[in-house]
From Swiss-Prot:
Record-level GO BP terms: chlorophyll biosynthetic process; protoporphyrinogen IX biosynthetic process
Gene designation per UniProt: hemL
The protein's name in its UniProt record: Glutamate-1-semialdehyde 2,1-aminomutase
Record HAMAP family: HemL_aminotrans_3 (MF_00375)
Cofactor(s), names only, from the UniProt record: pyridoxal 5'-phosphate
Pathway: Porphyrin-containing compound metabolism; protoporphyrin-IX biosynthesis; 5-aminolevulinate from L-glutamyl-tRNA(Glu): step 2/2; Porphyrin-containing compound metabolism; chlorophyll biosynthesis
Entry keyword Cell membrane: no
UniProt source species: Methylibium petroleiphilum (strain ATCC BAA-1232 / LMG 22953 / PM1)
Modified residues (N6-(pyridoxal phosphate)lysine): 272
Length: 436
């Protein structure tokens, strides 16, 4: 690929952009090789700088639930752009989007719009601390909540240890109040609350951890987490940047509410789908908590581009489309057909593979033994066969299927993916496995 336009663009990019990319996973460091520079997209497809077409299962890391260039979204964005790109003042459209989000999320009474998932998670964390008057927070190893300093933490040794920074440039003092636990571990959770319950402001969790590829929080674990937060006066914060309006119309929290009577988080963080591909995110919760935010309360949060009129037009059009009858049933069926086909192809080739899906989100792993179950936490994800995944990724890429270039990232199906696209993907999988 040395003489390709992708390669020359990457070489050029590395001279002016650190690592040649503006977000690390795009550099293909995890899988090796040359990243694809995308020239255009339409429906379920991407075209790279060399003109090669790919069936897209990244979907801009989740936002493109309708596919690329959906007519209703294009029309809304084009109209909004002619009216003005940014005002730094309130608009009717941001009120409409807030109302639409609240209609779909029963746990929330108010919502604040921001520009990125990192900003939303950081703001929700500050709000939780301000509302409770406490400092300590709990997160889980393998869950990603953006790159705010307090959340860039990995676990130390033991069941419940205060975190150590994952990134250089984050002082240890910044994360001394961050407690890192093992996902799906009830024993560790109970130990943490037993030792620190009166000091914990909030627990932040990805209900389906899409930054461990695809790992669900089990029902007993989630039920106990809700009980402990209530018992100790800590807020339960659902990070639904990835799962919100993606795995179900009401997000992952609606799935837990069906299985656990009365279940709801105290605060929710959204992004990706609510922006439809534009920079937009939000955090939401009960009025009594949300009104702790400035200008009403003492918790400060602000943003020049928050509620941007073009982004809100894109998000509003997207949310209205996904509410149409049968949308999620069709999306979930296509995702299930894809995952079942991938698993069947692997079984037929004698290759161990496990996977899971919900709504339009899926993930799969290559365990090192045929008897392995789905991973339940970060350590178990790390124990899967990364080298086999890398070979599979490149085999699929060569055959025109664009999967996430990292073992730890979920995949996404859109409404634009057709049965023919899925069958073409499965044919590529069979050929890739046969060539391995």
């Amino acid at each position: 690929m040395a003489d390709s336009r992708n390669a020359s663009l990457f070489e050029r990019a590395r001279r002016s952009i650190p690592g040649g990319v503006n977000s690390p996973v795009r550099a293909f460091r995890a899988v090796g090789g040359t990243p694809r520079f995308i020239a255009r997209a339409d429906g379920a497809y991407l075209w790279d700088a060399d003109g090669k077409r790919y069936i897209d299962y990244i979907g801009s890391w989740g936002p493109m639930i309708l596919g690329h260039g959906h007519p209703a979204v294009l029309e809304a964005v084009q109209k909004a752009a002619t009216e003005g790109f940014s005002f730094g003042a309130p608009t009717e459209r941001e009120v409409e989007l807030a109302e639409e989000i609240l209609k779909l999320v029963p746990s929330a009474e108010q919502v604040r719009l921001v520009s990125s998932g990192t900003e939303a998670a950081m703001s929700a964390l500050r709000l939780a601390r301000g509302a409770t008057g406490r400092s300590k927070i709990v997160k889980f190893e393998g869950c990603y909540h953006g790159h705010a300093d307090a959340l860039l933490v990995k676990a130390g040794s033991g069941l419940a240890t205060f975190g150590h920074p994952t990134s250089a440039g984050v002082p240890t003092e910044v994360v001394q109040h961050t407690l890192v636990l093992t996902y799906n571990d009830v024993t560790g959770l109970e130990a943490a609350f037993s030792a620190h319950g009166a000091e914990i402001a909030c627990v932040m969790i990805e209900p389906i951890a899409g930054n461990m590829n695809f790992v669900r929080a089990g029902l007993p674990f989630m039920k106990r987490l809700r009980e402990l937060c209530t018992q100790h006066g800590a807020l339960l914060v659902f990070d639904e940047v990835m799962t919100g309006f993606r795995v179900a119309l009401g997000g992952a929290q609606s799935l837990y509410a069906k299985a656990i009577p009365g279940f709801k988080p105290d605060l929710s963080v959204f992004g990706k789908v609510i922006g439809g591909g534009m920079p937009l995110a939000a955090f939401a919760g009960p009025r009594a908590i949300m009104e702790q935010l400035a200008p009403l309360g003492p918790v400060y949060q602000a943003g020049t581009l928050s509620g941007n009129p073009v982004a809100t037009a894109c998000g509003l059009a997207t949310l209205r489309e996904i509410q149409k009858p049968g949308f999620f049933e069709s999306l979930a069926a296509g995702t299930r057909d894809l995952l079942d086909g991938l698993l069947h192809a692997a079984t037929a080739a004698g290759v161990p593979m496990v996977g899971d899906c919900e709504g339009g989100m899926f993930g799969f792993f290559f365990p090192k033994t045929a008897q392995a179950a789905l991973p339940q936490n970060y350590v178990e994800v790390m124990a899967t066969d990364g080298e086999r995944f890398n070979r599979y990724f490149h085999g699929m890429l060569d055959r025109g299927v664009y999967l996430a270039p990292a073992l730890y990232e979920a995949g996404f199906v859109s409404a634009a993916h057709t049965p023919a696209d899925i069958e073409a993907t499965l044919a590529a999988a069979r050929a890739t496995l046969a060539a391995a």
